């Protein structure tokens, strides 16, 4: 942390010689400070829009702006600066003394100079909302970035909102069928719930979220909002074109489009990445308040936390555990509590959450666990076996796995599958040391079934067709339960393991077994 502080000190030291001339004017400032009454009477004026301040210091993404006495902008207000013909938005983060605010820039600060004018808009960052946003890509401040002209909507909404009141919230236990076997069977998603996809680098979070967009958003009649937070620009571009090709969106937006996209990718400054999730959520909240059932996808929530940590360090806050911001739980809670289902409409949210160094106890993923209804944990050890989606069947959890919600049969099959896999996991050390021959007959059977179940949990994805060459499969919940029930009961003990790998329903596994037998003969 000392390193980060050094440039700040040097910057301050360098700024001193430049400030020598105006230093004489310091006397009136002291007199102003000596008149607390004047400052207090000036406080109500603070909210007045249009106050003009001047930039006094620029350190990376942090910009200090000095305002006339009594015209200090409120915390979270947006300031506008004309940066060489480009509209730069700054968000007020701290009040320094009586007349200076410290702000976070929502875009690059190259080209800013001291003394430049900054105008207080008198309100937080406002983004366009409503059906006009469908089919369009916006950035954090609501500007279109898809080169399809301005977003023609009169309605705008502040990105900072309070969470719905307790009495407005609604809960109903209903499953959202995704067509992905491992998810629907072992950790089903709740309609109007919050779902987290946890995984390290390169285990398939984005592919899984894209598949969910494909399966759920296409079948779902309502609107979807996708917030790309600090992820690869290429993936955002691919998603945009994929949505147009599949008919979810029309080129350039307009009639027939069903998804709004809000992007703040890896190359953006931390201010934009820390706020873009809120901009996306604001668009989704507006649809919900109009009585819609909305799907809200976020890729990646970790980048929201990471950007918050960068901003926090720039603002000079003392870091907490592992260098994260001291307000980690507050930031996460303020956002997650807004993603909720009310009596007006619902938001079903799917969030990809990067797990640094595959450590689920890291404060960033650990903080988000508490807010979720279902967690899908992607495991590197399963991905290494070539089983995709690499969902860990024992680590993934869901509030919906309850016989009252999913029914007795589904519950019993899910628990049986997990107990077989758990037994296999316990036997793995013995197998590694002594080999299969030392196991009892019963354990040998358990291991054989567990290996088939493991393979049957894999499934070809529609969005991965271009890589794998095998067509995607959507499996009905009844077929999923039937297949795993038969596997646990031993109905398919005679089939080879390979027959269960990368197939949809159990019928396809039987077909594949016949093909394999024919090839072997």
Curated annotation (Swiss-Prot):
PROSITE patterns, A to Z: ATPASE_ALPHA_BETA
Protein location: Cell inner membrane
Catalytic activities: ATP + H2O + 4 H(+)(in) = ADP + phosphate + 5 H(+)(out)
Composition skew (Low complexity), residue ranges: 1-21, 28-42
Main location: membrane
Region (Disordered): 1-42
SUPFAM superfamilies with a match to the protein in the record: C-terminal domain of alpha and beta subunits of F1 ATP synthase (SSF47917), N-terminal domain of alpha and beta subunits of F1 ATP synthase (SSF50615), P-loop containing nucleoside triphosphate hydrolases (SSF52540)
EC number: 7.1.2.2
One Gene Ontology term, aspect cellular component: proton-transporting ATP synthase complex
Topological category with respect to the lipid bilayer: Peripheral membrane protein
Subunit structure: F-type ATPases have 2 components, CF(1) - the catalytic core - and CF(0) - the membrane proton channel. CF(1) has five subunits: alpha(3), beta(3), gamma(1), delta(1), epsilon(1). CF(0) has three main subunits: a(1), b(2) and c(9-12). The alpha and beta chains form an alternating ring which encloses part of the gamma chain. CF(1) is attached to CF(0) by a central stalk formed by the gamma and epsilon chains, while a peripheral stalk is formed by the delta and b chains.
Xref: NCBIfam families: atpD
Stated role: Produces ATP from ADP in the presence of a proton gradient across the membrane. The catalytic sites are hosted primarily by the beta subunits.
Family: Belongs to the ATPase alpha/beta chains family.
Name of the protein in its database record: ATP synthase subunit beta
